[in-house]
Amino acid sequence: MFTEDMRIADYDPELSAAINAEKRRQEEHIELIASENYVSPRVMEAQGGVLTNKYAEGYPGKRYYGGCEHVDVAEQLAIDRAKQLFGADYANVQPHSGSQANAGVYLALAKPGDTILGMSLDHGGHLTHGAKPNFSGKIFNAVQYGLNPETGEIDYDQVERLAKEHKPKLVIAGFSAYSRVVDWQRFRDIADSVGAYLIVDMAHVAGLVAAGLYPSPVQIADVTTTTTHKTLRGPRGGLILAKSNPEIEKKLQSLIFPGIQGGPLMHVIAAKAVAFKEALEPAFRDYQQQVVNNARAMADAVKARGYKVVSGGTDNHLFLIDLIDKGVTGKDADAALGRAYITVNKNTVPNDPQSPFVTSGLRIGTPGVTTRGFKEKEVVELANWICDVLDNMGDESVVEKVREKVLSICRDFPVYRANAKSGAAL
């Protein structure tokens, strides 16, 4: 029997210390990793609740266990809200992650050994788009497209040429590090020209799509996948969406369960339902617009300081700084900024001479700082602090000065503000 006053701090001080240190890091450091964000207390409440106790193999109304009448309600809410949010005819909220969602879709629509065409990892694609170390590059014959070296944008002519040459079963559009609007219809036309399915991975821009600030692929692609965190600001998890096609829907349902997963994580699905409801609110669109405004302001400020931005700017929540001409590696820049309490991630850039473990670039994203309340004024300041550190690599006095500024602005813009009634922060 358990009592409600049981706490980790009283039972496991080592773990409690790590959790508290991470809470402190999130409040005191500026988060610029494009795939990270902060969830609301409501999302955390759902994810930390009693639904974690329930096993529920199957789907709402068709479970293999009894006692699922209440979790059925939670999952159906998540499904209905996802469909409403994205204008989809089909939604599966059970994938544990974006990678699981992609795996399920690929295996539902293609066989091992089939050819898939996806964006190269070193040009901005994701591991699951055919990278050699990933399952997608191991069990499928993966062909990769990239960016036009002149524009820094997707080379659609190359995509079309490779599609006609290799006749892929799946054409995969989407990215993990690309700052421009993707022409989903051009991908649709290319896929149709070779009889391929079009799969779109919109994990990075799902929040922008939901807000109507980025073109939606949902009624263009055969299947669309996404994570439920990043710009969508929900729990870590995956989501599959599709336009109406009973044959594809049946394949997707059976491939997720029992194909690659067993029992769904009902507490995470409940948290997804909360996040989807939050994303349906008018304030969510305002938030997403500020995310884009902040990314553009930061990119412009970085360029004004003499740094190269891949493709020259951004249309979404992220941009890439190319450090090749500066003679600075992404690894060293990442570490120096980390000491200044600015968290970014090293990232490969087009024609990168460094290995993926070193790189010559940085990926910068604004979802997290926008959740904190940063607007253009604050992010331009932040961009200049970043450039101060990069201009003075090896000078720890500059790092220290920037760190003090970071701590000050973080105090002014806490992630989790004190409760007006109790006076307690989360």
Swiss-Prot record:
Cofactor(s) required for function per UniProt: pyridoxal 5'-phosphate
A Pfam family this chain is assigned to: SHMT
GO biological-process terms attached to the record: glycine biosynthetic process from serine; tetrahydrofolate interconversion
Residues annotated as binding (6S)-5,6,7,8-tetrahydrofolate: 121, 125-127, 355-357
Record site: Plays an important role in substrate specificity: 229
Record EC number: 2.1.2.1
Main location: cytoplasm
Keyword Ubl conjugation (UniProt): no
Residues with PTM N6-(pyridoxal phosphate)lysine: 230
Keyword Magnesium in record: no
Its biological purpose: Catalyzes the reversible interconversion of serine and glycine with tetrahydrofolate (THF) serving as the one-carbon carrier. This reaction serves as the major source of one-carbon groups required for the biosynthesis of purines, thymidylate, methionine, and other important biomolecules. Also exhibits THF-independent aldolase activity toward beta-hydroxyamino acids, producing glycine and aldehydes, via a retro-aldol mechanism.
Protein name: Serine hydroxymethyltransferase 1
Gene that this sequence comes from: glyA1
